[in-house]
């Protein structure tokens, strides 16, 4: 069994790490360079950096901050936010990113997935999906959860896989920041439909939630933000707990 990954996420707004609940009510959570270094030293398997206002505000992710974080960590680094064309990908990879996460731009221009996979390899392309459970199933949203689309979660992620996405980062907007556990039923459905890794996001509040994402949700990795930023869960203790639960971690 492949080792499960634990991934802290830095949600960046105006150069600072922030964390909200259900995608709103953002509060400060610390200096991203310091947090990135700390997580790398504590044994995080990867780090994700999402410039959460880039797509909404229509500006480019600041490569300089990416460069500073990358210089201070020794783990794989995924960067997302405001990536609309291959030149954006090139700039961020040159700044030290290992993978690129695309969300709104992929829904608007699905060909971008094909282009990134062709030019840089599928392993670079992470499809991020913000989805909300509605009466009509799981619907995908644009621009940091602000605009509902007609894309259905499973159908869209399957299309992205066919186009060359190497991973899916699925955030449940219903669960984001509320710390009651991940969307395990939806995760398990994705895992059964896709052959690429699925990263769980949205809902971590205690160690059991990570266990459940891996056992019930069949996720390959679990991402969290506030529980790590505010010291509620420490990564070495989490890995020790998961190991005791019979889950293979790095």
UniProtKB/Swiss-Prot annotation:
The keyword Ion transport does not apply. This is Imidazole glycerol phosphate synthase subunit HisF. PANTHER family: IMIDAZOLE GLYCEROL PHOSPHATE SYNTHASE HISHF, IMIDAZOLE GLYCEROL PHOSPHATE SYNTHASE SUBUNIT HISF/H IGP SYNTHASE SUBUNIT HISF/H. IGPS catalyzes the conversion of PRFAR and glutamine to IGP, AICAR and glutamate. The HisF subunit catalyzes the cyclization activity that produces IGP and AICAR from PRFAR using the ammonia provided by the HisH subunit. The keyword Amino-acid biosynthesis applies. The gene is hisF. Belongs to the HisA/HisF family. It comes from Bacteroides fragilis (strain YCH46). It is an enzyme of class 4 (lyase).
